[in-house]
Amino acid sequence: MRVPHLGLVRLLLVGFAMVAFGSGIGAQTSPGPDGWRIAGRDLDNSRSQPAERQISTENVHQLVPKWVFTTGSDVSATPTVAGNAVYFPDWAGNLFAVRADNGDLLWSHQISDYTGVPDTISRVSPAIFEDLLIIGNTNGVSWLSSASGAQAGAHVIAIDRHSGALRWITQVDAHPAAAITGSPVFHGTAVYVGVTSQEEGLAKDPAYACCTFRGSMVALDVFTGKILWKTFTVPDNQGLTNQYSGNAIWSPPAIDPGRGSLYIGTGNNYTVPDAVLQCQQEAIASGNPNPNCAAPDNFFETVLALDVATGAIKWARKLSAFDAWTVACPPTTLPPAPVGNCPALFGPDFDFPGSGPNLLHLPAQPEGPAADLVGIGQKSGIYWALNPDNGAIVWSTSVGPGGVTGGVQWGTATDGTRIYVAITNAQHMTFTLANGGPRIDWGSWAALDPRTGTILWQVPDPTPGTVDPGAVSVANGVLYAGSYSGAMYGLDAATGAVLFTFASGGSVIDAPSIVGGTVYWGSGYRNIAPGIGNNKVYAFTIPKAGK
């Protein structure tokens, strides 16, 4: 099936078929073991599928497409699955529901049908709650200044998953550049969504009045869309451009029902007050690398634990000393010098991007007692493990080079035995892979021991020169990882050996969902060079004997 491309302006850096879906879902308070209902599959944001038994290291090399669905543009969100339906958006502004068994279209809608803004898309995995789909939107750059009132900014949208009809829509942030890039997560009767923005990219225009956006986490009633609470990550700037701004939330949270906590990582500041810049500059001149210049409620590059019921901050662990940055700063500028809206003192842009936290559960072993950890990857290339009760750093591991478009980007995974991390290395920095590996200057994947952070294995992308910002998923001993080269890989989760390779036709930045012996995987991402566009979602399976 083909749909027309809308000519959507790419973002800066930064009658319908009705088919029965089978038996009903029943009461639902959190993602269950069946299907793949949210981006990370479970509240731990593990991106793992413990129920998978059909595809293994022994037969993953036999995977073949059982169907291929053609979209209107790139697909960068992990498809979600419930019953005999698969849901995913594309970068042409479409939202699709297709049959899981054969890929036939059930229905499709333009996101603009819900928002009233022509140039708008969704780039998140639809959360499946009972008979609802929950998504968020990103307005196209051409509409950031013209959309106003209720149409402006970021919205959370609930849709009837059987028909595509709108149930409710809530504006969660009216800032014109506000957007939703972190997939919604539900628990109980609330849905939780982080708010980011495109203002960091708009700042490259010297005429743009930079910057006023404030990152936040929002909880909404899943049935009505009423905002239950909203917690900001930046002090109130009163809409002034010479104050604190930024600290976007790009990713989905992890939720710990036992502790009543929600964990999330934040982005960098776009701007800070002049007094903070002066304090930082004086500290650097005096040899103090970690001055206490910023306001205590300026939560840049911070892991936050929020009360899941109220949004109150339980603890905050800042993991960078200072980082104010926009796209007007090096190395994204040519020549590499600050221009326009770059702060006078700028940082490395080591935010916590699309790679949300993993809630890790360590069983009792001779090496140590049972314990929980909050793990999270950063664009610095570091994976951190924190105490979920107080945010204390338990361990940290530098897995590979960091950078503006480097380090850990779109999503890590864990199966309880290992943590799986992709390293982008878009700056092509030469480094040595762990455990006597080769020296490379491109992307790689690694597995870490969740108790110690030790790198158990690390392997290069088989295509020299390519980068690997994409998320990963794991199921039944197989790690699924996509490459900017266009390849989809299945690796042995225990060793990193490549067992399966498929040329998808476009850069692969999403991780697949794995349900009932089928791998659902999107292809195409041209938003950041040198990405390769495509318009495909693949469903892979092991052919049955005799077919």
Put a short name on every predicted segment:
Residues 28-65:
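Blade/loop signatures of beta-propeller domains
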Residues 1-13:
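Bacterial N-terminal signal peptides that target proteins for export
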Residues 55-61, 90-111:
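Beta-propeller domains
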Residues 99-102, 160-163, 221-224, 308-310, ...:
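Short loop/turn segments that connect beta-strands within beta-propeller blades
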Residues 10-24:
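Bacterial N-terminal signal peptides
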Residues 33-41, 72-94, 118-156, 176-209, ...:
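Repeat-blade elements of multi-bladed beta-propeller folds
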Residues 110-117, 171-175, 227-244, 312-348, ...:
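Surface-exposed loop and turn segments in beta-propeller and other repeat-based domains
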Residues 64-66, 104-108, 165-169, 228-229, ...:
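A structural motif specific to WD40 beta-propellers
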